[in-house]
Amino acid sequence: MKKQKKILWKKGIHLAFSEKWNAGFGSFKKFYFPQNLCFLKAKLGRPVAWHRQVKHFQCNKGLHIQKTWIQDVPFCSKTKSGLATQNVSTLYPKVKRKDSKHFISSSRSLLKLQADKLLSSAKSLDHKYCREKSLLKAAPGLSANTVLGRANGHEPTTDPQASDFPMKFSGESQSPGDSGKTVVLNKHRKRVCHGCYQGLEHHRNRRPLIPKQFQLNQHRRVRASLMMYEKLSMIRFRYRIFRSQHFRTKSRVCKLRKAQRSWVQKVTGDHQENLRDNNTEGDNCNPVPSLEPKDPCRCQPYFPDMDSSAVGKGKNCHVPDGHTKENPVLDKEHGLDDTFPDQQNGCVAYNWDQSSSCPKWECTEQIHEIPLMEHPSSDKFSPETERALMALGQESGTSAVSDDREKLPVSGADKSVSSVDGPVSEEPAQNENFQMEEDGSLKQSILSSKLLDHPYCKSPLDAPLLCSEPKVENQMSGGKSSQTASPVDDEQLSTCLSGFLDEVMKKYGSLVPLSEKDVLGRLKDVFNEDFSNRKPFINREITNYRARHQKCNFRIFYNKHMLDMDDLATLDGQNWLNDQVINMYGELIMDAVPDKVHFFNSFFHRQLVTKGYNGVKRWTKKVDLFKKSLLLIPIHLEVHWSLITVTLSSRIISFYDSQGIHFKFCVENIRKYLLTEAREKNRPEFLQGWQTAVTKCIPQQKNDSDCGVFVLQYCKCLALEQPFQFSQEDMPRVRKRIYKELCECRLLD
């Protein structure tokens, strides 16, 4: 391995000192090969792969020798070109004859001879040209005759053109019979450029070894050129940027923009041309004042650089039928004042009419950014507009008009408008509303009715009125708040609330039955003032009080019933009512109308089902049921409450359920009980004629927790003979009322 490396190293040195390479450097004077340079086989045309270290060494050695020993050789020098071709002709047959991938090195004596020849030739070189200039001359495409060459300070010379160079690149078409070609591989930044040299062939006519002009690779858009000196890199970089697609597109767009005129320039230019034509046809001067202001102090109409309806060849110019774009004269029927009304959607119409014998030029200008602050109405001009029109009218009145000019038909409205030596009157602005109807389709395409309703199209004088309304409301609200400022401070209100809540806790054991109406009513009675605007403070005080008094020992005793706080807590929120609450409330109902109603205990039906009549026989020992008019029997089926009523006068057994459920066996059990009770009490009239009914048109619950509350409300309404005027939304209020009634041991109306 070491021996092979040594052989390759020697061959590299020999190749670097060979006269063929020196002739190449001396003749080209622009090429040096910093990376891979190898020969192709004549038949295969493939580059020879060198070892990496050998390539690096060969590159460095070649550069060093070329910089130190070889001096610049002018192009087309007969002695040097002959020497180069002679050396090439002596070396080329060896390469072609060997037909191997290794380079053929010369002997040590040949190497010395070639070195002596190079030294002698170097001494006789002409030092007139420096290396940089000679490189720029020989660079393909960057000769002294080009623009870039002149920019770098080079004068045009009579050197051979790049088109005479016998060099081909991989981009050119090559015949399959070409042989003896050298390929230059440029792998800088992973870009491979193949250049096939035909100058290394056996030159019988001793022509100089000159490369061809380079070409651009159209597919990759990368210029395939030989490596040049570092001083040419900046020129090549600038040239590449100059030829880039983005730069060319940008420059093309700039040229197009410069070539195109704005619509304002076109309009003014077209009018000036038309006026010049009219002047040549007429006798004296232009009847229409020029658009270019002669006096800087004189007001002239302003043409904004935006889409408008000005006459001319603008971008959005509308020309009526029967007139060409070059004709600035518009008749009455197709004039622009007929198409657009005055000041509609921010448009201001300027009318110049000198006399009945002169043509009339009417121009409408659309102003989007300048609102008319002085006159919000649509039939008046602004003062600045009137001054401009007055100046233009006076200027037009002084101009002479010939009699040979064509006269246009003018309507009565236009005749009243036209004046020779005065300003334009305000009448055409008012009459244009009637002339709009002639060309309504064109108007609707530009001026939409929806735009007129837009807030930006309204008069700016209306804005203060809109802005003043919230201020008035704020003042009124501020005055109301100042009037309702309560003289009662928070401390007094808190003290009063605390005393009232103490009374509620003492009477009801909790704040469950307390409602907002009760609190506000009590405060109004104390302070003779409405505290509805201070509800947040009141609610905060109640919450703090409830946190300090969470639970107390509160009990209710009524007859044989006793309720504690756990029983009363079932009435809070959406809790299920228990038997103690149902039974005690039924006792209150029964005591409210003792002669008519009898309320059975909630355990009655369960005892009847489990033990029969004998289990409940003693429950009615002191009561004659058949002397009552209504019997109320609550049915508790584990998780649901229902009600069975018995109307003794009509012998009807009814079933009430807040969910629409009908338990037939419950009704049958009650019917059997009544028959047995009639026999025991010796009441034969009640042994027959019993009927059962299911009541459906009654208030229904919409949750799963208020069935007990509905049953108690059914009982109360039936006992007091009141209609069912309640619903699910009334259940929170009904719960509070039941709580109060239980605590007070009486029914509240």
From Swiss-Prot:
Pfam families: Peptidase_C48, SENP3_5_N. The active site is at residues 640, 657, 707. Residues 557-718 are annotated as: Protease. Belongs to the peptidase C48 family. GO terms for molecular function: cysteine-type peptidase activity. It is found in: Nucleus, Nucleolus. GO terms for cellular component: nucleolus; postsynaptic cytosol; presynaptic cytosol. Its EC number is 3.4.22.-. It comes from Mus musculus. GO terms for biological process: cell division; proteolysis. This is Sentrin-specific protease 5. It is an enzyme of class 3 (hydrolase).
